[in-house]
Amino acid sequence: MRSSLLSSEKQTNTLLIAERATRLAPSDPVAHRARAIALTDAGQLDEAIREYERAIALRPGHYSLWVELGRARDQVDDQQGALEAFTEAARHAPYYAQPHWQLGNVLFRMGRREEAFAELRRAALSDMTLLPAAIDLAWAAYDGDARAIDRAFQPQNAPWHLALARFFARHGRPLEALEQFRAADKIPDTERRAFLQDLLAAKHFEESYEVWSGGLETKNTTRAGGIASITDGSFESGIKFDDPGFGWQLTTAASAFRYSLDTVEPKEGAHSLRIDFNGDYNPASPVVSQLVLVERGARYRLHFAARTEELVTGGLPVVVVSDASSSNGRSLAESSPLPQGTSGWQDQTMEFAAGDGTNAVLISFVRRSCGSGPCPIFGRIWLDQFSIDKL
C-alpha cells in the first residue's frame, strides 16, 4: 500500500512539473513530449495523444515522436491512427529499425500480412536481433509453411539463411533447414557447429552428416555418403575433444582416465587409442563413442580389436551399439567384456539389426555396472580397427 501511494505521488509530481514546463515553454516540443509521457504513465492516454500531436506540430520531422504517438494510439485501439503515425515515422527514418518494426506489427494485426512482413523484413535488415521474433511470428502466421516463410523474408545474405536454417531445424523441417544452410554458402565454423548441434538434437541425422562432413579438413576422414561408415576406425587422424558430429566423441569430464594415441604395437596402421584408467567414474558414461548412419531395417556386423594391460575392475568394459533414433537409446547389441589382467590383441564382432525407424546408431565404449557402491577401474586398454559391414 505504501509503495503504491508513493508511486502515485511521484506520478502526480512528474505530471505537475511537465505541465509547468509546457506553460513556461509552449513552443518547446520537448516540454510537450515530457507531458505526454507523464500523462501516459498516469493512464490518461487520450490527453497524452493530444500532447504528442502538439509536440509533432512543433517538430514534424522527428521520427521518435511519431513512434510514440503510434504506440499511444495503438493502446487505445486506434489502429488506423497508429498506422498513420508509424508510416510517418518510417518515412522520416527509413533506415531505423523501430519505425518499420512498429509499422509491421500494426499491419499484421490489421490482417495485411504481406505488407506487414515487408516492414518487418526492413526492420530486421537494420537490426538483426529482431529477426528471430519476426520468424516466430511468420511461423505462426503461415502455420509452419517453410516455403511461405522463405518467401516472406526473401533472405539475401548468409546470416539470414542461417537464422532460417536453425529455426527450421529446431521445428522439424530438416530438408528446408538444409536448403537454407546450402544457400548460406560459406559461414563461420562456430555457426556451422551451432546449426549441426540443432540438427543432432532434433535427431535429423542424415542432414547432420552433410553439415558435419562439409566442415571436414582431415584428409584421412571418411566422407562418402556416410552410410555404415566408421570415421577414423583406426585412430589415424588425431584426437579431437570439441568436434560434434560423426567422429569419435571423447569425454573431457572425467579425471579417472586419459587418452593418448599409441604408436607401440597398433593392431593396424600407425596408431591405436590408448586409455589409462586410474579411479572411479560412472560406468554408464561412454568413455569413447561414435554416431554412425545406417540403413533402416538393415543388418550389420561391427568389428573391433582390443587389448588390455593390468586391468582391474568390478565393471568390465564393453562396446555397445544403441539406437540413436529412438527416444530411449535402446540397446541393439553388446560385445563380450574385455578381459581382466593383461591380454594381447583380441578381435571381436557383434551383429545388430537397425529398426524400421532407425537411421543412426551410437557405438559406445562403456563399462558394465558393478552392482553397488563405487566402481573404480585401473589399468590400460587399447582400441583399434573399428569397421562395420552390411550383411
Feature locations, PLM:
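Helix-start (N-cap) detector for alpha-helical repeat units in TPR-like alpha-solenoids
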Residues: 29-30, 63-64, 79, 97-98, ...
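Hydrophobic alpha-helical transmembrane segments in integral membrane proteins
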Residues: 1-16, 20
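Canonical positions in the second alpha-helix
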Residues: 20-21, 54-55, 88-89, 122-123, ...
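Extracellular and organelle-lumenal recognition/adhesion modules and their flexible linkers in secreted
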Residues: 129, 155-391
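Structural marker of alpha-solenoid helical repeat scaffolds
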Residues: 24, 58, 92, 126-127, ...
